[in-house]
């Protein structure tokens, strides 16, 4: 998988999500390539451009987070601090867009635990992104109220 190349995803309603290249590089650095590597998690930060979303930044694992091989709990206060800083630096254009975490599988797919957690914890009138970083690929979904829809990666 190449790094520093942006990823573009599209859903059935032609909504586009662009993940900037430098963000892709950081996400790839957390892949669970070794059998002892724990899951990682953070938040997605970026811009809403009409129905389209651009992921410009992320928060990364840190103090307070609980990380195990097949479980992660994003508890660190630094995640919200990162969103607040991005919002201030961008004069209000960079916002919380959703969540990301890793899975120890090549082609990730949401677990029942993932879906339950998203339904319980992500409550918003805005659509929120749900990204899973696998060893060889990504899974991207969007939660709108109770509905989760899946994006397809556009190959470049």
UniProtKB/Swiss-Prot annotation:
Signal sequence bounds: none
Keyword Iron part of the UniProt annotation: no
Active site: 39
Record note on disruption phenotype: Not essential for CBASS function; when the operon missing this gene is introduced in E.coli it still protects against phages T2, T4, T5 and T6. Another paper shows the operon confers protection against phages P1, T2, T5 and T6 but not T4 or lambda.
Species classification: Bacteria, Pseudomonadati, Pseudomonadota, Gammaproteobacteria, Vibrionales
Source taxon at top rank: Bacteria
Binding site for Zn(2+): 101, 103, 114
Zinc found in the keyword field: yes
Cofactor(s), by name: Zn(2+)
Gene from which this protein is expressed: cap3
Pfam families, per database record: Prok-JAB
Regulation of activity: Cleavage of conjugated proteins is inhibited by EDTA.
EC number, as in UniProt: 3.4.-.-
Family annotation (InterPro entries): CAP3, JAB_dom_prok
Biological process according to GO: defense response to virus; proteolysis
Keywords: Antiviral defense, Hydrolase, Metal-binding, Metalloprotease, Protease, Zinc
Alphabetized NCBIfam families for the sequence: ICE_VC0181
Induction: Part of a CBASS operon consisting of capV-dncV-cap2-cap3.
Protein name (database record): CD-NTase/cGAS isopeptidase
GO molecular function: metal ion binding; metallopeptidase activity
JAMM motif, short sequence motif: residues: 101-114
Organism, as annotated: Vibrio cholerae serotype O1 (strain ATCC 39315 / El Tor Inaba N16961)
MPN domain mapped to chain residues: 16-156
Assigned protein family: Belongs to the peptidase M67B family. Cap3 isopeptidase subfamily.
Functional description taken from the UniProt entry: Metalloprotease priming reversal component of a CBASS system. CBASS (cyclic oligonucleotide-based antiphage signaling system) provides immunity against bacteriophages. The CD-NTase protein (DncV) synthesizes cyclic nucleotides in response to infection; these serve as specific second messenger signals. The signals activate a diverse range of effectors, leading to bacterial cell death and thus abortive phage infection. A type II-A(GA) CBASS system. Reverses the primed state of DncV, the CD-NTase. Cleaves a DncV-GFP (green fluorescent protein) fusion protein precisely at the C-terminus of DncV. Overexpression decreases the efficacy of CBASS protection against phages T2, T4, T5 and T6, blocks formation of DncV-conjugates in vivo, and inhibits in vivo activation of DncV. Antagonism of phage defense upon overexpression is CBASS-system specific, Cap3 from this bacteria only antagonizes its cognate CBASS system and not that of C.freundii, E.coli or E.hormaechei.
